[in-house]
Amino acid sequence: MTLLSDLGIWDERLVVWANHIVERWPGFDLFIVWLLKAHLPRFVPLILAMCWLWFKPHPNQPARREVLLEALLMSVFALFVARALALLLPFRERPLGHLELGLTMPASLDTGLRTWSSFPSDHAVLAFVLAVSLWRISRPIGAWALFHATAFICLPRLIVGFHFPSDLIAGASLGAALALLAPMLQTRHAITGFLLRAEVSRPATMYSLGFFILFEMAEMFDSVRVVAAHVFKAARSMLG
């Protein structure tokens, strides 16, 4: 038996085991659906922590701000990489699409993600880019961020069958690796230094841009995706 087949067996066993708690307690189902559908409990706490660290006075504040800027840039890059992998790698059906697993879905949950490839989890990618970046600045805040990313962003997606465990582990590993790779890049000081100087010389422009990026991160760039999809469809129809 190959390693991949072993992994597939454990993927299925773990997602079935995690899913068995669905429809046991109505209040728990509502809580899980809220975590999956609402933007507030997922990425907003991580973004608030980033904002707090940005403005909190600290002897090493410039270095902290460099790390936060790296987190912003790597978040955008990481989501691009995750979507590229999902499109380029062989399509992987989400667990909820495997009817033989007999997974139970909360009644109020939208299953419109069936047509999206399951591997890797872009939610896990973004969550762990931010969490590991926060860990680089503050170990206590980083530990909380890693717990939040695991318990409130990744685990609910496993429970309802949006992802297999390997999807989430791959996404988390990719996000963590990119966050740890950022300080090794030779161009990091040039880029973050330019942005920090621009923040001083053009604060209105930079903070407006920062707010836009943070807002889009909080909603997983859903607005940008919708606009891009409409533009793509319009361009394709015009080109015949």
Residue ranges and their predicted role:
Residues 22, 26-30, 59-63, 67, ...:
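Membrane-helix interfacial "entry" motifs
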Residues 36-55, 123-130:
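Hydrophobic alpha-helical transmembrane segments
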Residues 30-33, 63, 142-146:
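Membrane-interface alpha-helices at helix entry/exit sites of multi-pass transporters
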Residues 1-47, 82-112, 222-240:
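N-terminal transmembrane-helix/juxtamembrane module of multi-pass inner/ER membrane proteins
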Residues 50-82:
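Interfacial segments of alpha-helical transmembrane regions
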Residues 1-4, 69-89, 210-220:
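N-terminal signal-anchor transmembrane alpha helix
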Residues 107-232:
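Membrane-embedded catalytic cores of phosphoryl/pyrophosphoryl-handling enzymes
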